[in-house]
């Protein structure tokens, strides 16, 4: 077998016809600037071809379900294995997907609870046992010899009704007596039962005496009673109060509730057999949220303090205004009073109605026929009930979307957010229900499995299941995810977390001879846990697999067996193999930027002095969201603050859920529901908050950097102002590819046409009318400085900056894109082709190009994702520019180069999950380095 993957003439995206040999069965790291072509080589060439060849070996029928990769643009490749890609984009958005289901641990848990679980009554909590006829007889024969018994069939247990048919059937079957509500009756007499009361009826099947030769008779009687009562038998010991109840089913003798036989599907929230019927197994329900109806209680109703579809206006001429006036009159409050000063009874009535009590409504209308006024009486249903009713009745998507703005996800009241029906939640293993184990952090779940006490019989049944569960939990712990719970929704995980979960799942699969391609697995991981991740990667390699990791993290690069540095720069200036070999080879290479940072020739300096917080601070008091332990935190204004801590310590809960959502709600008038906290102060000096994350700048291929930054509007105005356009009567709309007029109608302005290929991937070909140029011929005839609109959109930012050098407005926006290191992207490049890091930098550039108010709070969540050390250097300059203008920058980050340039650090921890959520340290980086309790400080000390 080849010991190398040999590639010749790779030309995907910006790759410049490169030839390279990569060793197999090794840990290979590909590095280089953002946009240099690493992903083009790793994913679009090696993975695409490995996957395509594997899929091509399957039947045509199977291929149509798998979705085939396009053949990459290259001359030759050999030495490939079947390829598995673990990137960051494919984390599930399905609300049914959890950490437990993704890793398959939950499937083994379902099997465990079905095989060795102990059922309890969902109503009274009493343990339920199932017994066979033989077990019942054995128990009865243990009674002292000579004991007199009555064998009864409990046909009715605490049910309302006259039960005439039950008694008639028993009489017809030859039974003579029955015990009704504890008293004996002859079935020959007429028994009158009150149909409104609950009754219990036991038919007397036989009277027996316990002795060895009576076994046959007792067995027959027990079988008969069981048949009559659907598996239940009562043995009444004559002359004493003792009564034995037996069940052949899982049924509670006291409550009469029976549960079906335990099966794995009973514990699945994705099947009707196990899912909570109220929330269909989602654990959450969308309900009207009063906090979103009254987002700011400092305002009065007259000032528009109520923000709900159909209820915003307090004007007398509107229906809502009529109701408000009537409510104010009846409950004695003023519509100009701030809502927080209204009596609680009044607020309650506004939200939940008058409970059938009529209100006196006055109307005063005027139209062409004249004016008319009067009054009438009508109860008020309340805003919450009104929105709920309209939401379920309306057919209008617009109306539903409007009402949804007042709704939030609330844990289901029936199952308490645990997704399962009550019968499944009443089964325990080791005293815990399946939902309780799913809610444990991985570390605690390992302890629980280790400490399980089982009977010898249960141990034999559960041995293999427990081994699988423990092994998979161990893999999650090894990739630094021991703070996650198995019930955590997959859609709430960060890119790095979901990637490491899939990595743990792959190790669990124990495949050999596979080519794994990973995209920055260290994202979101604290330096403390990096060693665990590297050990996991080496473990995969040692099993006999080849690993190609696209990575910027210094520890990972240094741990690699072989490094491929792509560059030297980004975009059109990249796409070459700058250097390949060991760490020493890379460090010795003059052309390699990576080598220069690794060797220390280039580095990000520690700032000579740090900004002082002179504008006050934002203070959050009593933060309790997720695992935050009722903490008080201050964010100084006008400086750069880094929020650090190990994975799962509560950084996102504090910054994204509380700080961002609260300020967005109060300053940006956003309809967001912040996380739990007591109070927030210090917002007077802020005008808005902006979250610059790595989500795409647009969801469709039609959106691009030019449309996002506003450049496209300026360019279209420029073309519309040319003499040629004015003669033809073209306005700016003519130069848009999104609307009729100037666009090519054959491809609707896409530039491409899709051709459906059955059994093969769909083929996109350039439109044969416009040749992929998106516009019709007349529009393309209009030129500015010799270029038409298509040619301008096809320019890189760098080229456009020179082209528009004498237009200050355009030049300013282009320069900010250059400043953030995006000179290589094209103005019209589809936003779907941009990486997360590139999308974030387009957003940063857009913010930089706006006039700064000096009172904005910027939130950046791990902005160094996908960035090379040189890109991080550039990012730091941008962050400094934002802060130097007086703005406040709050960054969640693990990258030490960014942490060391911060003016203020808030370190959360000390651990993740339950053991996190407290403030370990707050102060300058220098002070943090001296804090022994801070993991971040320990790593920071080496850099300062």
For the regions a language model picked out, list residue spans one by one:
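Conserved phosphate-binding elements of NTP-dependent enzyme cores
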Residues: 1-944
């Amino acid at each position: 077998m080849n010991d190398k993957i040999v590639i010749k003439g790779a030309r995907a995206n910006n790759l410049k016809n490169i030839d390279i040999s990569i060793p197999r069965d090794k840990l290979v790291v590909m590095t280089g600037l953002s946009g240099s072509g690493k992903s083009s080589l790793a994913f679009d060439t090696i993975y695409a071809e490995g996957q395509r060849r594997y899929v091509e070996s399957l039947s045509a029928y199977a291929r149509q379900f798998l979705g085939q990769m396009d053949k990459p643009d290259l001359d030759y490749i050999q030495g490939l294995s079947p390829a598995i890609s673990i990137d960051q984009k494919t984390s599930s958005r399905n609300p049914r997907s959890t950490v437990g289901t993704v890793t398959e641990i939950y499937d083994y848990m379902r099997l465990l609870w079905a095989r060795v679980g102990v059922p309890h009554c969902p109503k009274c909590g009493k343990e339920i046992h199932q017994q066979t006829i033989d077990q019942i007889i054995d128990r009865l024969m243990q009674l002292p010899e000579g004991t007199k018994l009555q064998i009864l069939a409990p046909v009715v247990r605490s049910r309302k009704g006259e039960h005439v048919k039950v008694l008639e059937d028993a009489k017809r079957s030859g039974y003579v007596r029955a015990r009704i509500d504890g008293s004996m009756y002859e079935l020959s007499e007429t028994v009158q039962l009150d149909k409104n009361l609950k009754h219990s009826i036991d038919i007397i099947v036989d009277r027996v005496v316990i002795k060895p030769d009576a076994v046959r008779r007792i067995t027959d009687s027990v079988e008969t009673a069981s048949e009559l009562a659907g598996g239940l038998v009562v043995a009444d010991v004559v002359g004493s109060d003792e009564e034995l109840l037996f069940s052949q089913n899982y049924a509670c003798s006291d409550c009469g509730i029976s549960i079906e036989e335990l099966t794995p599907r009973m514990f699945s929230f994705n099947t009707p057999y196990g899912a909570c019927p109220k929330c269909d197994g989602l654990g959450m329900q969308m309900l009207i949220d009063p906090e979103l109806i009254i987002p700011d209680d400092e305002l009065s109703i007259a000032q528009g303090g109520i923000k709900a579809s159909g209820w915003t206006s307090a004007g007398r001429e509107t229906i809502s205004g009529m109701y408000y006036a009537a409510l104010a009159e009846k409950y004695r409050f003023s519509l100009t009073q701030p809502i927080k000063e209204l009596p609680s009874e009044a607020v309650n009535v506004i939200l939940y109605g008058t409970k059938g009590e009529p209100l006196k409504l006055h109307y005063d209308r005027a139209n062409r026929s004249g004016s008319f006024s009067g009054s009438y009486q009508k109860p008020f249903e309340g805003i919450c009930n009104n929105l709920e009713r309209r939401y379920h009745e309306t057919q209008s998507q617009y109306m539903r979307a409007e009402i949804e703005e007042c709704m939030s996800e609330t844990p289901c009241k029936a199952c308490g957010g645990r997704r399962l029906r009550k019968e499944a939640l009443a089964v325990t293993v080791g005293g815990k229900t399946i939902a309780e184990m799913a809610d444990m952090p991985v570390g605690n779940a390992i302890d629980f499995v280790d400490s399980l006490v089982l009977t010898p019989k249960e141990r034999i049944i559960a041995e293999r299941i427990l081994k699988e569960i423990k092994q998979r939990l161990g893999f999650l712990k090894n990739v630094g995810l021991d703070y996650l719970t198995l019930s955590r929704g997959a859609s709430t995980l960060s890119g790095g977390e979901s990637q490491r979960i899939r990595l743990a799942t792959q190790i669990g699969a124990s495949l050999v001879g596979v080519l794994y391609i990973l995209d920055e697995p260290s994202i979101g991981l604290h330096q403390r846990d990096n060693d665990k991740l590297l050990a996991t990667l080496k473990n995969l390699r040692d099993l006999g697999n080849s690993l190609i990791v696209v990575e910027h993290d210094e520890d990972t690069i240094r741990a690699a067996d072989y490094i491929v540095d792509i560059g030297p720069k980004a975009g059109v200036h990249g796409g070459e193999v700058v250097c390949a070999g060991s760490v020493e080879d890379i460090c010795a290479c003059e052309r390699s930027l990576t080598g220069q940072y690794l060797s220390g020739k280039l580095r990000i300096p520690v700032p000579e002095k740090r900004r002082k917080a002179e504008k006050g601070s934002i203070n959050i008091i009593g933060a309790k969201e997720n695992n935050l332990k009722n903490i008080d935190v201050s964010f100084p204004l006008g400086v750069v603050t880094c929020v650090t801590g190990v994975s799962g310590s509560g950084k996102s809960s504090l910054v994204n859920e509380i700080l961002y959502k609260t300020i967005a709600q109060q300053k940006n008038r956003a309809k967001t529901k912040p996380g739990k906290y007591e109070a927030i102060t210090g917002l007077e000096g802020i005008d808005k908050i902006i979250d610059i994350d790595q989500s795409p700048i647009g969801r469709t291929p039609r959106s691009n950097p030019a449309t996002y930054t506003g450049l496209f509007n300026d360019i279209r105005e420029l073309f519309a102002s040319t003499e040629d356009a004015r003669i033809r009567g073209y306005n700016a709309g003519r130069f848009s590819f999104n609307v009729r007029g100037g666009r090519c109608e054959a491809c609707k302005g896409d530039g491409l046409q899709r051709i459906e290929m059955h059994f093969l991937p769909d083929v996109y070909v350039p439109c044969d009318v416009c040749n992929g140029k998106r516009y019709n011929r007349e529009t393309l005839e209009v030129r500015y400085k010799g270029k038409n609109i298509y040619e301008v959109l096809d320019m890189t930012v760098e080229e456009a900056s020179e082209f528009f050098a004498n237009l200050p407005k355009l030049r300013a926006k282009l320069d900010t894109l250059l400043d953030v290191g995006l000179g290589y992207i094209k103005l019209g490049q589809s936003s779907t082709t941009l990486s997360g890091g590139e999308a974030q930098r387009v957003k940063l550039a857009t913010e930089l190009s706006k006039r700064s108010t000096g009172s904005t709070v910027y939130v950046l969540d791990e902005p160094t994702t996908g960035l090379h050390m040189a890109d991080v250097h550039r990012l730091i300059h941008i962050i400094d520019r934002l802060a130097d203008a007086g703005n406040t920058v709050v960054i969640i980050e693990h990258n030490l180069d960014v942490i060391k340039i911060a003016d203020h650090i808030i370190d959360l921890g000390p651990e993740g999950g339950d053991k996190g959520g407290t403030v370990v340290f707050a102060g300058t980086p220098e002070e943090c380095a001296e804090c022994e309790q801070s993991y971040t400080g320990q790593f920071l000390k080496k850099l300062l």
